[in-house]
């Protein structure tokens, strides 16, 4: 019953926003903006408090919460499982529904691996919970961020798992509501020197924004000076030019001296961009992600922004999640799954999601390591995605192992900073004709314009140090050395545009690092500069 007052407030807020927009030129109605902000924030705080209480109860009674989630799945199934509908016994459920994999063979020519068929409607409550709790956590850590005119989003996508129709403009977010022009979003942000928070859908999208700002900075400064759009701001345009002339390091704080935090949605393949942004453009700023978006719409919640980046709570409510233990060096098909309360600290597990519509238990491929607990629920760090494994001779180089080896190799390239990378097995590009199969590795760097042969060889050496199996195959000549290519600026932006155009692509938010389709690999191959 308490939900109805909140819904009434939400219905009133768009009307207030419209009235504010229509009468924004009338100084006599400036009080309306303050009223609108107070009403919006009061509704948000109330809703977040309600969601937090629900989360506390569910994490204190994990087994009961997961039983309810399982019952929710069984009742919503679109195919008959009569024996299951009458029982939520976990053993019966597991015996009737064997584990399946998100197939790597059912790929469309125009995209990456399709995700499990989880309904957005089914996951709506989980995404709403992540958004409300994330906003509350952000406000607690940075109280001034959600004040009027202190936040700007610079990408079309939002970092909030379920962007609400009212908080952005109502809570004073900079920019025109509903704009579909990324350039307009960036211009609105650049015109506002008092920002406290910068939002972007994901870290890789924000990386593209800053790279584009370096390229198009003079054009953007000219638009600000000319008042296109808005009033002419010649002094602000001069500040933009001066900030860009000093290079990328610390650029965000030069543009917005009061900036405190960067808000992006965490997902697979984003850590590299976060590191690059933190070392260069966003140096000195905190990063906050309200959630981790795993495969199939599963969300890990970030309830404590002050903790180390990358720790997330796996909530026990719908959708129904199980954990499949990962054995070192193998993935046992016959291993039994565990419930959330049975997870052990220090162990690694693959997430298993039950799709409500098809009643399918699907192995998502997302591997987590349990690092702590919140009440009775595991707090995890997402380690890797099994579908991002490289294997040309059965060597199985995992995403985490490859990223670590690449990081060590780049660390030996004097002056180089890794911005982006993508991998392709040689068979995709038919580049192993007359030679052993190998990896084609494409990198985007800052601080290094050419790769020497010595630089290229270091990645292969690091891979051999990291994987005895790979080293053995290299020794016998069964696998050729990894070939490293430097791509020009804009290569990965073009790749992301191609990915975003694919309906079955996981991007955004997840960024694939192993490309399985020729046309995607060619986005990088065609832009090699060294």
Curated annotation (Swiss-Prot):
Q: Which residues are glycosylated?
A: 450
> Which residues are the signal sequence here?
1-17
Q: Where in the cell is it found?
A: Endoplasmic reticulum; Nucleus envelope
Please describe the post-translational modifications of this protein: Methylated at Gln-489 by N6AMT1.
> Keyword Signal, does the record have it?
yes
**Which InterPro entries has this protein been placed in?**
GH3, GH3_C, GH3_M, GH3_N
* Positions of modified residues (N5-methylglutamine): 489
Instruction: Spell out the residue ranges making up region: Disordered.
Output: 99-122
Q: Does the keyword Lipid metabolism apply?
A: no
Any one GO molecular function term: acid-amino acid ligase activity
- Write the record's keywords in alphabetical order, separated by commas: Endoplasmic reticulum, Glycoprotein, Methylation, Nucleus, Signal
Q: Name the family the entry cites.
A: Belongs to the GH3 family.
What is this protein's name?
GH3 domain-containing protein
Q: Which organism is it from?
A: Homo sapiens (Human)
Q: Which gene encodes it?
A: GHDC
């Amino acid at each position: 019953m308490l939900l109805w007052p909140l819904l009434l407030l939400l219905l009133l807020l768009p009307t207030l926003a419209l009235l504010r927009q229509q009468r924004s030129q009338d100084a006599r109605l400036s009080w309306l903006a303050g009223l609108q902000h107070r009403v919006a924030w009061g509704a948000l705080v109330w809703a977040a408090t309600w969601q937090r209480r629900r989360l506390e109860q569910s994490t204190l009674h994990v087994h009961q919460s997961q039983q309810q989630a399982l019952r929710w799945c069984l009742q919503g199934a679109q195919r008959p499982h009569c024996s299951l509908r009458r029982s939520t016994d976990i053993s019966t459920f597991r015996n009737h529904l064997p584990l399946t994999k998100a197939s790597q063979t059912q790929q469309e020519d125009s995209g990456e691996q399709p995700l499990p068929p989880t309904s957005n409607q089914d996951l709506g409550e989980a995404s709403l919970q992540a958004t409300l709790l994330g906003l509350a956590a952000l406000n607690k850590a940075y109280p001034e961020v959600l004040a009027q005119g202190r936040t700007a989003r610079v990408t079309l996508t939002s970092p909030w798992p379920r962007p609400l129709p009212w908080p952005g403009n109502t809570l004073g977010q900079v920019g025109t509501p509903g704009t579909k022009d990324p350039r307009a979003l960036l211009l609105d942000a650049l015109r506002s020197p008092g920002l406290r928070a910068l939002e972007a859908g994901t870290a890789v999208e924000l990386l593209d924004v800053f790279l584009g700002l370096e390229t198009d900075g003079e054009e953007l400064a000219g638009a600000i000076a000319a008042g296109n759009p808005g009033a002419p701001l010649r002094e602000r345009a001069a500040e933009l030019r001066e900030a860009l002339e000093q290079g990328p390091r610390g650029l965000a704080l030069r543009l917005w001296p009061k900036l405190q935090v960067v808000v992006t949605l965490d997902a697979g393949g984003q850590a590299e961009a976060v590191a690059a942004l933190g070392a260069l453009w966003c140096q000195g700023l905190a990063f906050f992600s309200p959630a981790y978006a795993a495969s199939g719409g599963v969300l890990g919640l970030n309830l404590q922004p002050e903790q180390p980046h990358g720790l997330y709570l796996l909530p026990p409510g719908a959708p129904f999640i199980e954990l499949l233990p990962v054995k070192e060096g193998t993935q046992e098909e016959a291993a039994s799954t565990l419930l959330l309360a049975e997870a052990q600290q220090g162990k690694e597990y693959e997430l298993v999601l039950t799709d409500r519509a098809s009643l399918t238990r699907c192995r998502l491929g997302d591997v987590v390591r349990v690092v702590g607990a919140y009440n009775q629920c595991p707090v995890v760090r997402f380690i890797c995605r099994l579908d991002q494994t490289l294997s040309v001779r059965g060597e199985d180089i995992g995403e985490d192992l490859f990223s670590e080896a690449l990081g060590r190799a780049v660390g030996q390239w004097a002056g180089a900073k890794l911005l982006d990378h993508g991998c392709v097995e040689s068979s995709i590009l038919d580049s192993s004709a007359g030679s052993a199969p190998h990896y084609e590795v494409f990198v985007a760097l800052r601080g290094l314009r050419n790769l020497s042969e010595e630089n290229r060889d270091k990645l292969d050496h690091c891979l051999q140090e990291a994987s005895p199996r790979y080293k053995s195959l290299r020794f016998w000549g069964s696998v050729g050395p990894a070939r490293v290519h430097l791509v020009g600026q804009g290569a990965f932006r073009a790749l992301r545009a191609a990915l975003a155009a694919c309906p079955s692509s996981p991007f955004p938010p997840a960024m694939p690092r192993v490309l399985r389709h020729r046309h995607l690999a060619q986005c990088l191959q065609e832009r090699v500069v060294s």
